[in-house]
């Protein structure tokens, strides 16, 4: 038989009760876990990105743009220092 891999056909998997019992639990669980990861702020801590209220400080209200590519590290240090 050419083309037979011995695997279960995809249509059989999708019409299986077992498939939907497993995935009716895992898909909403992944969605809820992702929502909690972002809404609790843990995503900001894990990836090191600033929270929305940390983009601008009291002293610096302008957009922190890097303008000199050769002295970029000094500019980043200046922007990230806490006053």
Swiss-Prot record:
Annotated positions binding heme: 23
Gene Ontology biological process: photosynthetic electron transport chain
Keywords, in A-Z order: Chloroplast, Electron transport, Heme, Iron, Membrane, Metal-binding, Photosynthesis, Photosystem II, Plastid, Thylakoid, Transmembrane, Transmembrane helix, Transport
InterPro entries found in the cross-reference section: PSII_cyt_b559_asu, PSII_cyt_b559_asu_sf, PSII_cyt_b559_CS, PSII_cyt_b559_N, PSII_cytb559_asu_lum
Cofactor: heme b
GO cellular component: chloroplast thylakoid membrane; photosystem II reaction center
Membrane topology recorded in Swiss-Prot or TrEMBL: Single-pass membrane protein
Cofactor, free-text remark: With its partner (PsbF) binds heme. PSII binds additional chlorophylls, carotenoids and specific lipids.
Job of this protein: This b-type cytochrome is tightly associated with the reaction center of photosystem II (PSII). PSII is a light-driven water:plastoquinone oxidoreductase that uses light energy to abstract electrons from H(2)O, generating O(2) and a proton gradient subsequently used for ATP formation. It consists of a core antenna complex that captures photons, and an electron transfer chain that converts photonic excitation into a charge separation.
Family stated for the protein in its record: Belongs to the PsbE/PsbF family.
Protein name per UniProt: Cytochrome b559 subunit alpha
Species the sequence originates in: Chlorella vulgaris
């Amino acid at each position: 038989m050419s083309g037979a891999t011995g695997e279960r056909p995809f249509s059989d998997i999708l019409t299986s009760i077992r498939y939907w019992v497993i995935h009716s639990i895992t898909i909403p669980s992944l969605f809820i876990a992702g929502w909690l990861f972002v809404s609790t702020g843990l995503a900001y801590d894990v990836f090191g990105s600033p929270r929305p209220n940390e983009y601008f400080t009291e002293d610096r209200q302008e957009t922190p743009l890097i303008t000199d590519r050769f002295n970029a590290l000094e500019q980043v240090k200046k922007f990230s220092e806490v006053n």
